[in-house]
Amino acid sequence: MKAKDIRALTTDQMLEKEKQYKEELFNLRFQQATGQLENTARLSKVRKNIARIKTILSEKALENN
């Protein structure tokens, strides 16, 4: 997900997306631990998406203050 797409979301939608990505990251880590993970690049993509969302949320919080 690109930063442009994330910025178009509302704060509630961003929080929901972050929650979804965290759940996916949790599942991917389990798959990696058991040797079932085929697409290891997905781990870093999900982590980066979480970071993008957190960054944009903090930018919005600073804007409002």
UniProtKB/Swiss-Prot annotation:
This is Large ribosomal subunit protein uL29. GO terms for biological process: translation. SUPFAM superfamilies: Ribosomal protein L29 (L29p). The keyword Coiled coil does not apply. It holds the Pfam family Ribosomal_L29. GO terms for molecular function: structural constituent of ribosome. Keywords: Ribonucleoprotein, Ribosomal protein. GO terms for cellular component: cytosolic large ribosomal subunit. The lineage of its organism: Bacteria, Bacillati, Bacillota, Bacilli, Lactobacillales. Belongs to the universal ribosomal protein uL29 family. It comes from the Bacteria. CDD domains: Ribosomal_L29_HIP. InterPro entries: Ribosomal_protein_uL29 (IPR050063), Ribosomal_uL29 (IPR001854), Ribosomal_uL29_CS (IPR018254), Ribosomal_uL29_sf (IPR036049).
